[in-house]
Amino acid sequence: MKRDTKRVAVIYGGWSSERPVSLSSGQQMAAAARKAGYDVTEIDVTRELASQLAEAEPDVVLNGLHGPWGEDGCVQGLLEVMGLPYSHSGVLASALAMDKLKSKAVYRSAGLDVAADKRVTRAEAAAAHALPPPYVVKPVNEGSSFGVLIVREGANGPPHELTGPNWRYGDYLMAEEYIPGRELTVAVLGDRALAVTEITTLRDYYDFDAKYAAGGSRHVIPADLPAKVTEAAMDAALLAHRALGCRGATRSDFRYDEQKDRLVILETNTQPGMTPTSLVPEQAAHMGMSFEDLVAWMIEDASCQR
């Protein structure tokens, strides 16, 4: 089917805590898809998504959603039921990758190095140290570093935020060994890893503001690493992508502890940010692929039974 006759529904927005990020990704992808010659309909997702899609009658769905409902297998399941080819990973891979504990079980079975962890409730994590400090507390099913808390060495007690009135990230958490070192990320497109980017920030860690605020972080591509570490990170990202059963584009994040020469995988994002300056498009551009071409690749890669 020619591009100018292929109807593409770009879905974005939704109601998760990552809605602002999704709006940015989706609108940028829609603009790129139009520039590439596709017939594009933009859909700001509501709980009536099935009706929204039925009205749009797309040939392909380009998924620009982030966070719960959009990247945890829920929307993917709806698209499978409706028989609409869609981008990125399928139901099972999306659900596994979104659950930090389940994805780490997959990593372990694949032979990847992961940080020690423990599943805890919010009440348990608030009552006493879940692990010996330093450690990190993460919601099991959130993205964009929402709800991530670092407990430093010497901390007198667990994070006070867990008992505060503004906590909205659920009652099931993962306490994880804190891995010092350099923040690395690797994008995978289909069956190939693209490059290794090092992320530096003046903040305590790569949090929401570091990820999305102007000047919040600096991306070094390619990362200045020993060749063996670069190769190991790219191999590990591709292995994680395959072990989870992912399709399309993913981005895996790592910590590299130079003192111990230890490369630890943190997570795999099945719906990575998709603005022209996001990490995956940056790596694609580094490899000679424009943002427009990247979006077109995702559209042409779309399918059901992913």
From Swiss-Prot:
GO biological process: cell wall organization; peptidoglycan biosynthetic process; regulation of cell shape
Subcellular location per the Swiss-Prot or TrEMBL entry: Cytoplasm
Pathway: Cell wall biogenesis; peptidoglycan biosynthesis
Annotated keywords: ATP-binding, Cell shape, Cell wall biogenesis/degradation, Cytoplasm, Ligase, Magnesium, Manganese, Metal-binding, Nucleotide-binding, Peptidoglycan synthesis
Binding-site positions, Mg(2+) 2: 267, 269
SUPFAM superfamilies per UniProt: Glutathione synthetase ATP-binding domain-like (SSF56059), PreATP-grasp domain (SSF52440)
Amino acids binding Mg(2+) 1: 253, 267
Annotated ATP-grasp domain residues: 104-300
GO molecular function: ATP binding; D-alanine-D-alanine ligase activity; metal ion binding
Pfam families reported for this sequence: Dala_Dala_lig_C, Dala_Dala_lig_N
Residues that, per the record, bind ATP: 131-185
EC number assigned by the record: 6.3.2.4
Keyword rRNA-binding annotated: no
Gene Ontology, cellular component aspect: cytoplasm
Cofactor comment: Binds 2 magnesium or manganese ions per subunit.
Names of required cofactors: Mg(2+); Mn(2+)
Coarse class of the protein's main subcellular location: cytoplasm
Annotated catalysed reactions: 2 D-alanine + ATP = D-alanyl-D-alanine + ADP + phosphate + H(+)
Matching NCBIfam families: D_ala_D_alaTIGR, PRK01372.1
Function, as annotated: Cell wall formation.
Family named by the database record: Belongs to the D-alanine--D-alanine ligase family.
Protein name stated in the entry: D-alanine--D-alanine ligase
